[in-house]
């Protein structure tokens, strides 16, 4: 058990911050798609079109990743709709 714990810690040390942030972005898209009852790809395209990933999720990673999943998804949906309506 202790050896497995050490192996897991070593793997986690090798994961870069960028990989962690990208996994968070993927989780944001997936959770938003689930809440909207639509596909991951559709939500990704909508977010990309309005710059939500580059201009909201990535720059705000630190505060966003500490939110509960429910609050995070509600914020993302609200932001997505508001930004789309500005176009």
Residue spans for each PLM region:
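General helical secondary-structure elements
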Residues: 9, 13, 42-45, 65, ...
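Short hydrophobic/aromatic-rich motifs at helix boundaries and adjacent loops
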Residues: 1-3, 12-16, 45-48
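Amphipathic, hydrophobic secondary-structure cores in small proteins
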Residues: 33-35, 39-64
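Long, compositionally biased
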Residues: 2-5, 60-87
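N-terminal acidic leader/helix
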Residues: 7-40
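Intrinsically disordered, low-complexity, basic-enriched segments
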Residues: 18, 30, 45-46, 54-55, ...
């Amino acid at each position: 058990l202790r050896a497995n714990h050490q192996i897991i810690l070593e793997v986690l040390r090798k994961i870069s911050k960028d990989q962690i942030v990208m996994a968070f972005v993927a989780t944001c898209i997936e959770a938003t798609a689930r809440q909207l009852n639509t596909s991951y790809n559709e939500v990704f395209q909508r977010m990309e079109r309005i710059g939500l990933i580059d201009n909201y999720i990535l720059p705000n990673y630190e505060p966003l990743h500490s939110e509960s999943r429910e609050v995070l998804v509600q914020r993302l949906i609200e932001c997505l709709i508001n930004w789309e309506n500005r176009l």
